[in-house]
Regions:
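N-terminal non-catalytic structural scaffold regions of very large proteins
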Residues: 1-184
Length: 184
């Protein structure tokens, strides 16, 4: 069923290896895993694995500096840079495209349209309400946002009602309201 699933395994020397799978109601599965060298990999729809930084670049965060700014000095991200042969948005996009569609001619336009269709077209990718609920519940969404300010207005997708305005400090009550509403 749609949602996010976690697993922890151990390698030969006892190091913990983490993995998770995001299963949408409709669309491509995303499988994340770490290896014994702390490199963070992703598989899109059960294809060959690529460093997570390739996917991040393909989604528009192109340079190492931008990735570090977003994720901080996370050791698994830094270790992934060593395995990543791409250095910018276009290279990351083409690298991911090669893994998803091996043997097809490489073109930035084709790669962009594939990524947009796979992850940003609601007709082709949908977590569904159950998947979104499970995702938020497992990630403890409502507990983690308490005490933070909202960067933009939060709108209920079913009614169009503004639930909270930008720059609002999130309280426990507001977090619970957002958790229980139809906010994606």
């Amino acid at each position: 069923s749609p949602g996010i699933y976690y697993a922890i395994a151990h390698d030969k020397i006892g190091k913990r290896l983490f993995s998770s799978t995001v299963i949408p109601n409709r669309g491509a599965w995303l499988e994340y895993e770490t290896d014994s060298n702390d490199v963070f990999y992703v598989r899109v729809d059960r294809t060959r694995k690529v460093p997570i930084t390739v996917l991040i670049r393909a989604l528009g965060i192109g340079t190492n500096a931008e990735i570090v700014e977003l994720f901080g000095e996370e050791p698994k991200i830094l270790a992934s840079f060593a395995k990543d042969t791409s250095t910018n948005y276009q290279e990351g996009l083409l690298e991911l495209y090669k893994k998803i569609r091996p043997g097809e001619p490489l073109a930035v336009e084709s790669a962009e349209s594939l990524i947009m269709a796979m992850f940003f077209d609601p007709r082709r990718y949908d977590l569904a309400k159950v998947g979104r609920y499970k995702f938020n519940k497992k990630l403890h969404f409502n507990k983690r946002i308490v005490g933070h300010k909202l960067s933009q207005d939060v709108v209920d997708t079913t009614t169009g009602e503004i639930l909270a305005e930008a720059d609002t400090l999130v309280t426990k009550e507001l977090a619970d309201t957002l958790q229980n509403s139809a906010v994606p």
